[in-house]
Amino acid sequence: MATGKIVQIIGAVVDVEFPQSNVPSVYDALNVTDSKERLVLEVQQQLGGGVVRCIVMGSSDGLRRGVEVVNTGAPISVPVGTKTLGRIMNVLGDAIDERGEVGAEEVYSIHRSAPSYEEQSNEIALLETGVKVIDLICPFAKGGKIGLFGGAGVGKTVNMMELINNIALQHSGLSVFAGVGERTREGNDFYYEMQEAGVVNVEKPEESKVAMVYGQMNEPPGNRLRVALTGLTMAERFRDEGRDVLLFIDNIYRYTLAGTEVSALLGRMPSAVGYQPTLAEEMGVLQERITSTKSGSITSVQAVYVPADDLTDPSPATTFAHLDATVVLNRNIAAMGLYPAIDPLDSTSRMLDPLVVGQDHYEVARGVQQTLQRYKELKDIIAILGMDELSEEDKQVVSRARKIERFLTQPYHVAEVFTGDPGIYVPLKETLRGFKGLLAGEYDDIPEQAFMYCGSIDDAIENAKKL
């Protein structure tokens, strides 16, 4: 194995000089020899003269020029298979849960090519989530890519936790959770919540259903840039075994941000809004690998932070292109105290097609959107002239729209500790029955507050009796 010496250190970027005859390839992993903990460098550029520029997969504190570095001759490889279940790992696949080595029989390189056209599956099946607004307006595809878009503090992580709770527990398949540049506290909470739910079994790890890979906010940009690929590699292995896997990534924006930091350190010219010039390519490399094959499926749910609530920002805009369903969280809905704060007029899904969901579902969903859109248009008139100036027909639209807005709320299992209300899983059949009745005027006599935070329409009728 070729050895080289560190010649320059600029934060998370390190230059290493090798003999001209033994220069490492791009993406090769290099091991730093005299580091107390395992420290890996990943080659990003060949500068000529035997010098390669690398990003550090860890802290560069204490590194100095002249330190010896060994080329492994292969990209970073991480453990895969059932031994990863119930464990928390870092970007290199090393266990960070203080429960010993992962001890997997097999390792995969984190840099792999996407499945070919022949291998990809084109089956269409719906994935029920138990969340009314999602199942009605933006239904998820099994094996599809779903994005949760929202600014700071509107509920991306809570919605993702609820989806993990509803889908992973109901679906009883395997899941991989990649925490990319998020808060350590959230990762810690998630781990203990999964233990309480029985998804992680510490005594019998083989009975666990989820593998966790974390690269938190305090980690260097190299870790945050590669941790999504580590999680995806583990999910790909389960898929190739013929399983249906759920891949949760929180947050895809931090992946882009880490790429921006690394790009600047590597000396690349920034593009729009300071993002890296390779933004679309980096996003494509990750997203194209998240796909279903004829052997198994990967259904991915990705939280996407929207900077300053601007959906036209290059990072969320680049992510949009790859998704099958987009769930947009709206700050104005959250400000009204209506949770989940999902915007039914902005959220979309390619599955909302009469040929996929059926004519009945399609008409109910479009009817709900039309009613809410009309109410939105009438809000200005109401603000200036008041309700009395509206026609009888418009008054009815407003009344129904306000009931629909409230009926789209529901208590979450994961929020029970904050709200005190037990969570409710609402089957799609019940969701459609409730909204169909609302549009037809069957519940015009029920006061709107009865619809707040209820499950099925029967709960709303019960609430009305108590008012």
Swiss-Prot record:
Keyword Transmembrane helix: no
Keyword match Disulfide bond: no
SMART domains, alphabetized: AAA (SM00382)
PROSITE patterns (alphabetical): ATPASE_ALPHA_BETA
Keywords annotated in UniProt: ATP synthesis, ATP-binding, Cell inner membrane, Cell membrane, CF(1), Hydrogen ion transport, Ion transport, Membrane, Nucleotide-binding, Translocase, Transport
Cellular location(s): Cell inner membrane
Domain of life the protein comes from: Bacteria
UniProt xrefs under CDD domains: ATP-synt_F1_beta_C, ATP-synt_F1_beta_N, F1-ATPase_beta_CD
One GO location term (cellular component): plasma membrane
Subunit note: F-type ATPases have 2 components, CF(1) - the catalytic core - and CF(0) - the membrane proton channel. CF(1) has five subunits: alpha(3), beta(3), gamma(1), delta(1), epsilon(1). CF(0) has three main subunits: a(1), b(2) and c(9-12). The alpha and beta chains form an alternating ring which encloses part of the gamma chain. CF(1) is attached to CF(0) by a central stalk formed by the gamma and epsilon chains, while a peripheral stalk is formed by the delta and b chains.
Family listed: Belongs to the ATPase alpha/beta chains family.
Function according to Swiss-Prot or TrEMBL: Produces ATP from ADP in the presence of a proton gradient across the membrane. The catalytic sites are hosted primarily by the beta subunits.
The protein, known as: ATP synthase subunit beta
Organism: Vibrio alginolyticus
Lineage: Bacteria, Pseudomonadati, Pseudomonadota, Gammaproteobacteria, Vibrionales
Annotated gene: atpD
